[in-house]
């Protein structure tokens, strides 16, 4: 019950959506530093060499606020994907497939409109967003805060993309090792932001 999406602004619990299991909902409210720290902790737990060298410089409210982080070359442990790796996975892994150019990970825009923070039935099958957050189907208006079912949802309740990955569109944002940058028109090997 400490997952932030499980609580309203006054710390009372939301009712979970359609029997969602709290333990199967995504973690949220973690810093980028928390995410790389977790990668190292999981690596150590599984006997793998941690992928990051981390020197924590500031912690606030149990979260790492600042740290010096570097990638350990050739480490066998878990790490965050690069932005390019995340995009490759979200697009379905095959640049020659139609899904590579879909508007959403796993679905194209079904109602012929581009998504611009508006209702779009093309997104309903693959992602949770402000218009389908409670029922899973697009409603006539955005979902407001402090409503039963508002917040994150159990992972895997929507359709997976071509690689079998869920929630690459909607639910929560994912951390990447680097940042987004505009793609060059040419080929780039192992791009980073």
Q: Which residues fall in each region the model found?
A:
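Active-site microenvironments of metalloenzymes and redox enzymes
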Residues: 1-123, 180-185
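Short, intrinsically disordered, charge-balanced linker/junction segments flanking boundaries
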Residues: 25, 189-193
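Structural recognition of the beta-strand scaffold that forms the well-ordered cores
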Residues: 26-29, 79-81, 87-88, 127, ...
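Short, flexible loop/turn elements at secondary-structure junctions
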Residues: 31-34, 84-85, 130-133, 159-162, ...
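Short, well-ordered junction/capping motifs at the entry into regular secondary structure
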Residues: 67-73, 120-169, 188
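Short loop/turn segments at secondary-structure transitions that flank enzyme active sites
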Residues: 95, 132-135, 169-172, 179-181
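Short, low-complexity, polar/charged sequence segments that are solvent-exposed and flexible
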Residues: 98-100, 174-175, 193
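Short, electropositive, low-hydrophobicity segments enriched in small/polar residues
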Residues: 110, 116, 131, 168, ...
């Amino acid at each position: 019950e400490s997952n932030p999406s499980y609580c309203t602004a006054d710390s009372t619990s939301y009712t979970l959506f359609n029997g969602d299991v709290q333990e199967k909902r995504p973690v949220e409210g973690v810093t980028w530093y928390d995410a790389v720290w977790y990668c190292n902790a999981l690596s150590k737990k599984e006997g793998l060499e941690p992928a990051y060298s981390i020197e924590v410089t500031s912690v606030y409210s149990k979260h790492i606020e600042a740290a010096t982080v570097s990638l350990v070359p050739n480490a066998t442990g878990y790490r965050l994907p690069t932005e390019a790796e995340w995009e490759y996975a979200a697009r379905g892994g095959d640049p020659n497939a139609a899904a590579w150019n879909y508007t959403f990970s796993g679905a194209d825009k079904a109602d012929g409109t581009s998504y611009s923070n508006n209702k779009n039935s093309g997104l309903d099958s693959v992602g949770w967003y402000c218009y389908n957050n409670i029922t899973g189907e697009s409603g006539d208006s955005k979902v407001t805060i402090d409503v039963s079912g508002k917040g994150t949802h159990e992972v895997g309740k929507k359709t997976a993309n071509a690689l079998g990955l869920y929630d690459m569109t909607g639910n929560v944002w994912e951390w990447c090792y680097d940042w987004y940058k505009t793609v060059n028109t040419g080929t780039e090997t192992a791009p980073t932001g």
